[in-house]
Amino acid sequence: MAAKEIIYNESARSMILAGVNALADAVKVTLGPKGRNVVIEKSFGSPTVTKDGVTVAKEIELENRFENMGAQMVREVASKTSDIAGDGTTTATVLAQAIYREGSKLVAAGHNPMEIKRGIDKAVEAIVEHLRGSAKQTKDAKEIAQVGTISANGDETIGKLLADAMEKVGKEGVITVEEAKSADTTLDVVEGMQFDRGYLSPYFVTDPEAMKANLEDCYILISEKKISNMKDLLPVLEAIAKSQKQLLIIAEDVEGEALATLVVNKLRGTLHCAAVKAPGFGDRRKEMLKDIATLTDGQVIAEELGLKLENVTISDLGRAKTVIIDKDNTTIVGGQGKKDKIKARQQEIRAQIENTTSDYDREKLQERLAKLVGGVAVVKVGAATETEMKEKKARVEDALHATRAAVEEGIVPGGGVALIRAQSSLEKLKVNDEQRFGVNIIRRAIEEPLRQISANAGEEGSIVVQKVRDGKDSYGYNAASGDYGNLLEMGVIDPVKVVRSALQNAASVASLMLTTEALIAERPKEEKPAAGGAHAGHGHDF
């Protein structure tokens, strides 16, 4: 085992502080509407230009291993905040730096770090309570657009696009961000349920120009098994041919004789039909087929339910107003499912989202929920160069998370003002003298985001903080325009979830670092010179 190096007490804390400052000073220049960019070198390709705090934080590795520990702890603050709220990473970093900087002075002066930590925890609890109490629920698309604009660093087009997307697919709908092929940023909305399986044969196409198969007012047969034998399908095909309706078959696969018969009937015009493979794999496929069945008021034909293909009647089939199939996707619009059953299915999926621990499963469940609730919106981000595209895409993703957070827990005045207003909640706290120091650390630290926003805008932080503190409610400083006024009316707003998560994560990690007394790291290995180098080339005979 390699030898370890250990440092204690004051030297440990000063090393942590040096690491915290190195990372936070690089991140905090990006805060606010007048924040600056950071350029990051890449081992290949062009450098990345970013104004996103967590992207900067993730790139920082310090040479000194003890300082690096401090930097990595603060990096954890930024990435945790990004995971929970999707935004507020720079605010969280600024708060963590302020809490640790103030706290380490007190610990050095001989105060009890455990009591300080308790004071910090109580203060954070009081502020979170105050933030939740003063939250205003987002009602209209305009407010959602304002949240998106601020999170996208003042880009109004992004804010408006996201507000449109939310209006079209609902608050639970899935909004995805993709790179566009052109320089324009656009919004595509897919209504109804779409899954990534196309037609099994191009002979099903009804619109040769667009290469799409369109079915109107059709029946939908949903089977879990592979269909290859024509005999099994005959009874249901005859019934549908009599009813003069159209048919979509969704099955594990349709092949051989069964597929050939469907194609021949389609070409002869005796039966207007199409077949696609079922989406997903394994258990997820079963669940997705149940979703389609619920949406269209059909029945999944599965042997475990005692249903066989040859016994299927028209009443077991789903119904939909329109089905559009291209070579890659199938979209079902206007499913005839019963509202109460669809609601029950949505609740079931929501419960699974609450209980799952896997991020991948959660993402897939949210996609399924969105398809049942209303649809999917795709924001296609366009830019003139790839460097700009990457930077813009990161901003759109941030803005998307922020708008979701705003819808979830409501909004408060932005620009660091909500935290200043929450200072009043610290007056009534019952704490002992040592804990009071912890409370005072938080009182001072929560001014830091506003100070930094002002400094980045070229103003003197202390003067701005004093002016804002003298005001009431939503009165604050709009760094984008340089004016003071009602921030809610000006559209300078932050989601409660973002502000809350930033403070909670910053306080959690900073107070842990305050109670640290020793750091242990591996001693660097000394490089030995290569053996035999001195005698090489002297013509020895062996």
From Swiss-Prot:
InterPro entries: Chaperonin_Cpn60_CS, Cpn60/GroEL, Cpn60/GroEL/TCP-1, GroEL-like_apical_dom_sf, GROEL-like_equatorial_sf, TCP-1-like_intermed_sf. Pfam families: Cpn60_TCP1. SUPFAM superfamilies: GroEL apical domain-like (SSF52029), GroEL equatorial domain-like (SSF48592), GroEL-intermediate domain like (SSF54849). One of its GO terms (molecular function) is ATP-dependent protein folding chaperone. Signal peptide: none annotated. GO terms for biological process: protein refolding. Forms a cylinder of 14 subunits composed of two heptameric rings stacked back-to-back. Interacts with the co-chaperonin GroES. It comes from the Bacteria. NCBIfam families: GroEL (TIGR02348), PRK00013.1 (NF000592), PRK12849.1 (NF009487), PRK12850.1 (NF009488), PRK12851.1 (NF009489). Belongs to the chaperonin (HSP60) family. One of its GO terms (cellular component) is cytoplasm. It catalyses: ATP + H2O + a folded polypeptide = ADP + phosphate + an unfolded polypeptide. This is Chaperonin GroEL 2. It comes from Sorangium cellulosum (strain So ce56) (Polyangium cellulosum (strain So ce56)). Keywords: ATP-binding, Chaperone, Cytoplasm, Isomerase, Nucleotide-binding. Its EC number is 5.6.1.7. It is found in: Cytoplasm. Together with its co-chaperonin GroES, plays an essential role in assisting protein folding. The GroEL-GroES system forms a nano-cage that allows encapsulation of the non-native substrate proteins and provides a physical environment optimized to promote and accelerate protein folding. It is an enzyme of class 5 (isomerase).
